[in-house]
Regions:
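Gly/Pro- and small hydrophobic-enriched strand-loop and loop-to-helix capping segments
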Residues: 236-250
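Short, Lys/Arg-enriched N-terminal segments with co-localized hydrophobic residues
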Residues: 9-20
């Protein structure tokens, strides 16, 4: 039986005289995180099945930004291996020891990257999801050559054209992706977006999917705790989920 089935049995066993009992308040933090992880995986599988997608084609990126290593260990103990961090320095402080203790970790940079942190980012992360401007792309290309280490790269698209948000504007995506590929020799694997918080996410997910299709890009990082099932419907290959697993951040 898989993890999702085990969670369903666990929930069923908590029913007493026809009433649902909450597991989370009665169990320790490890059990809470484990149950939440499985709950998200159930939701991902359900969404994939509902829209004729293979569940194994969609990866859960557990967003661990602002959470201490002790909390992350509980997700690792529960079997999660793919994580997302916003800041290079925070990742450098937390993850070397965790990598020593747990095999198979894949670490994604999901926050904006400063060019003076490109060397550390290439050294630290397996995936950089926020390639968002020529200066950063050039710095990453130089570090890939210098370090002989090539993290997977995704271009961040600012689908809402928000002035305060990072990302290439949709109308500039063609030229930027071409620059990354043809001028810098970067292997762009896919696209990433963060829709505006005050708008419906579906048009932004659909736009990202259209741009990816135009460029033959297979990977789409979109969808967070509140809308990952919708993102799966519209083609996400990676969903970035934090609060639904770890709870609210301090």
């Amino acid at each position: 039986m898989d993890e999702c089935g085990l969670l369903i049995l666990k929930i069923a066993s908590a029913r007493v005289e026809g009433h649902e009992m909450s597991l989370l308040p009665e169990e320790g933090e490890l059990q809470q995180i484990s149950a939440r992880l499985l709950g998200v995986r159930i939701g991902m599988r359900r969404a994939a099945n509902d829209f004729d997608r293979a569940p194994e084609s969609i990866q859960l990126v557990c967003v661990s930004k602002n959470f201490p290593a002790a909390t992350i260990r509980q997700a690792l103990d529960a079997g999660q291996r793919v994580f997302g961090e916003n800041r290079v320095q925070e990742a450098m402080a937390k993850w070397p020891e965790l990598r020593q203790d747990f095999a198979g970790i894949e670490l994604h940079l999901i926050g904006q990257l400063q060019s003076n942190k490109a060397a550390e980012a290439v050294a630290t992360f397996d995936v950089i999801e926020t390639v968002d401007r020529p200066k950063i792309a050039s710095a990453i290309a130089a570090e890939i050559k210098a370090q002989r280490k090539a993290p997977k790269l995704l271009v961040q698209i600012n689908t809402g054209a928000e002035t305060q948000k990072a990302g290439i504007l949709p109308g500039e995506a063609d030229a930027f992706i071409g620059y990354c590929r043809n001028e810098l020799g970067l292997d762009i694997a896919g696209l990433m977006c963060i829709p505006p918080v005050d708008q419906q996410a579906s048009p932004h997910f659909a736009l990202l999917a259209r741009i990816a299709k135009q460029h033959g890009l297979a990977e789409l990082s979109m969808g967070m705790s509140a809308d990952y099932e919708l993102a799966i419907q519209l083609g996400a290959t990676h969903v970035r989920v934090g609060s639904a697993i770890f709870g609210s951040r301090s």
